[in-house]
């Protein structure tokens, strides 16, 4: 019962789409109609720049943190992981936006930094390094997600947290499947390339 309650609460928190809300009320646009069509911080960055993307990213991270803390309060570490997966699913497929959300990376950052701070920080640092070196946000996001899985395999804590990391990485890779195709084709947008709003 608590597991279901935890998942529902976390999912609904994830459904609060900060990219959509911020751009709708500050620029009167639906961010999903611009750039990559993704309702997330990276697309806000691409379309509106750093000043708009920063609060969206921060709020997306925060909702991951809040969901995990609620899950931990209700069910301990198991609840934290259930909530972590559910909040990312809510971000990716929000019921209030007809299941068209973001890719879950910023929210995943909040989740892993709360569930496993040290390994989360290492994975984040590696992901950011890849972004800085290549200018591909998608590549850095995927790398960071996979790194978190590998770190959990190397510094084994429990089967539960390894499966948790594997699910999070799978969600990230699935949401970036179109980016992977563009990366392979050499057509993926780099950090700094901006889409103008007419």
Swiss-Prot record:
Probably interacts with PlsX. Belongs to the PlsY family. It is a multi-pass membrane protein. It is an enzyme of class 2 (transferase). The lineage of its organism: Bacteria, Bacillati, Bacillota, Clostridia, Thermoanaerobacterales. The keyword tRNA-binding does not apply. GO terms for cellular component: plasma membrane. This is Glycerol-3-phosphate acyltransferase. Its main location: membrane. InterPro entries: G3P_acylTferase_PlsY (IPR003811). The chain crosses the membrane at residues 2-22, 48-70, 75-97, 111-131, 154-174. Its EC number is 2.3.1.275. Catalyzes the transfer of an acyl group from acyl-phosphate (acyl-PO(4)) to glycerol-3-phosphate (G3P) to form lysophosphatidic acid (LPA). This enzyme utilizes acyl-phosphate as fatty acyl donor, but not acyl-CoA or acyl-ACP. GO terms for molecular function: acyl-phosphate glycerol-3-phosphate acyltransferase activity. Pathway: Lipid metabolism; phospholipid metabolism. It catalyses: an acyl phosphate + sn-glycerol 3-phosphate = a 1-acyl-sn-glycero-3-phosphate + phosphate. GO terms for biological process: phospholipid biosynthetic process. It is found in: Cell membrane.
């Amino acid at each position: 019962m608590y597991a279901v309650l935890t998942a529902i609460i976390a999912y609904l928190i994830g459904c609060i789409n900060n990219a959509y809300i911020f751009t709708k009320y500050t620029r009167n646009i639906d961010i999903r109609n611009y750039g990559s069509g993704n309702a997330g911080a990276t697309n806000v960055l691409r379309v509106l720049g750093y000043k708009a993307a920063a609060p969206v990213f921060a709020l997306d991270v925060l909702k991951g943190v809040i969901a995990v803390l609620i899950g931990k309060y209700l069910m301990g570490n198991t609840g934290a992981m259930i909530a972590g997966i559910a909040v990312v699913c809510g971000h990716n497929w929000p019921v209030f936006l007809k299941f068209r959300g973001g890719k879950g990376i910023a929210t995943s950052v909040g989740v892993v930094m709360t569930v496993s701070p040290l390994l989360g920080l290492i994975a984040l640092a590696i992901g950011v390094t890849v972004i800085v070196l290549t200018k591909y946000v998608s590549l850095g996001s995927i790398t960071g997600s996979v790194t978190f899985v590998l770190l959990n395999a190397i510094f084994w804590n429990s089967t539960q947290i390894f499966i948790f990391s594997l699910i999070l990485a799978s969600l990230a890779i699935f949401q970036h499947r179109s980016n992977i195709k563009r990366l392979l084709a050499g057509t993926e947008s780099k950090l700094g390339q901006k889409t103008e709003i007419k």
